[in-house]
Every structure is written in C-alpha cells, then in structure tokens.
Amino acid sequence: MIEEFTHTNAQERVREDMASAITALDFLATSIGRLAALHEADEEDAIITEGRVIAAKREMVKAVTGLLEAE
C-alpha cells in the first residue's frame, strides 16, 4: 500500500530525522570525550572538538524547536 504524502507526514519525518541527528551528535560528543581521556596529549584539541560538536547539537535543537513552533 502506498503511503499518502501529507504535510503532517513530512513534519513527522523531519522530527524523526532531527531526533536521530541529535542522538548521533550526543554519541559523537561522548566518543570524543572518551578519546580525549585515552590520549591526554591531545586532550585540549579533543575538548575543543567536543565543544564544536556540542555547539552543533545546540543548533540542531534550535532548528527542531523552530520547526515545532512553526506548526
């Protein structure tokens, strides 16, 4: 059966995709933190990179929030 494409379906798919992206960014930030602990010499760079990942996550959350508020 073919699923009818509606505005509501599209919004739900966007929400699901954004949630998946946020989950992936969380995992990436955690992984970078763990790598930093293993390689203390590179810890400063890892912390900077982890901060960038967290900033990207914040932007993703803002985008999702904006989409939800626009409904």
Spans of model-derived segments:
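Short, charge-rich amphipathic interface segments used for partner binding and complex assembly
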Residues: 23-71
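N-terminal acidic leader/helix
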Residues: 2-36
